[in-house]
Amino acid sequence: THLGRYFYKQEDYLDSGKMGKYVIMNRAKPTNNTQFIEENKTLWKPYFKKNMGKNGSTGWGIASRIAPYYEDSSTILTWDVFDSMTNVMKYLAGENPLPTSIANKTKMGELMPKGFKAIEIWEIIGSTN
């Protein structure tokens, strides 16, 4: 882990308008950033939009890292915002399985053969509009 200041470009996001309490930060280093971002926008964003609120989710997004660059560091950050720790745990435990329509189309296994580099849970203490 490298300490310091990180700069990201927000590529896309969803916001339900409801304040979340916890956010899952997914750090990724896909084999192709452009394809990863495009799949998130065209496949995953509609899925999250359709299901927003059903599982306690209040937000979703994706960003690409601008700087700093380290050879083994993540280059993409995605986030999922939830209303409670209970709903975070249910989500991470796979209690809301993916529909086959998504599972059959995703290329995540090819774009990230080793999965996410890190998955972190952060508590939201405050925010501004």
What is the predicted function of each stretch?
Residues 1-129:
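Short S/T/G/P-rich N-terminal loop/turn motif that feeds into the first structured element of a domain
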